[in-house]
């Protein structure tokens, strides 16, 4: 019996889909992160304040010999602000914290993270938790652009297992 049209169609559709997914991911890696879209939930002054605080919490590294002459990006460069903008939008995962951010970022404008921590520890804890989520999370959620934290930690990325630990490093 020969190959039916249905089997042929299903097989070629699956192959084309798998190839598009594989090569599309490689193209994104080659071209780099997409250009940063403007924030839609946060106001420009909130974006600036949040970016400054986030970069104090996870600052960029200066260029270093151990990283091929490059430092690791800080929170702002790793798209943590955009991550938070997306997740604070109405209906998104952190939408319930939107008003908290609006009020407390206005108070924090022009202030150092240490001052915010001292004067407003509850908001500071929330901010720190969310900045870490954006920096260390899976890039598919909008942060950790270019796998910044994964490269810094020397891990393969999402879905890595103990077998993916680089030589000379211990798992766990």
Question: PLM features: what roles do these ranges have?
Answer:
Residues 2-7, 19-56:
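C-terminal segment of N-terminal export signals and the immediately downstream linker at the start
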Residues 52, 64-172:
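Mature-region segments of soluble proteins
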Residues 61:
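Glycine-rich, often acidic-flanked micro-motifs
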Residues 32-37, 58, 81-89:
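Short, charged, low-complexity loops and linkers
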């Amino acid at each position: 019996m020969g190959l039916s049209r249905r089997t042929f169609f299903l097989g070629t559709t699956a192959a084309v889909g798998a190839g598009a997914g594989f090569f599309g991911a490689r193209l994104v890696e080659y071209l780099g992160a997409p250009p940063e879209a403007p924030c839609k939930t946060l106001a420009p002054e909130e974006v600036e304040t949040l970016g400054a605080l986030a970069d104090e919490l996870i600052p960029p590294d200066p260029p270093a010999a151990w990283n091929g002459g490059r430092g690791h990006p800080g929170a702002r460069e790793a798209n943590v602000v955009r991550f938070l903008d997306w997740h604070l939008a109405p209906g998104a995962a952190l939408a319930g914290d939107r008003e908290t951010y609006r009020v407390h970022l206005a108070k924090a404008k022009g202030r150092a993270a240490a001052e915010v921590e001292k004067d407003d520890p509850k908001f500071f804890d929330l901010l720190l938790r969310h900045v870490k989520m954006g920096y260390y999370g899976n890039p598919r959620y909008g942060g950790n652009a270019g796998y910044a934290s994964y490269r810094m930690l020397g891990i393969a990325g999402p879905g890595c297992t103990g077998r993916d630990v680089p030589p000379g490093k211990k798992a766990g």
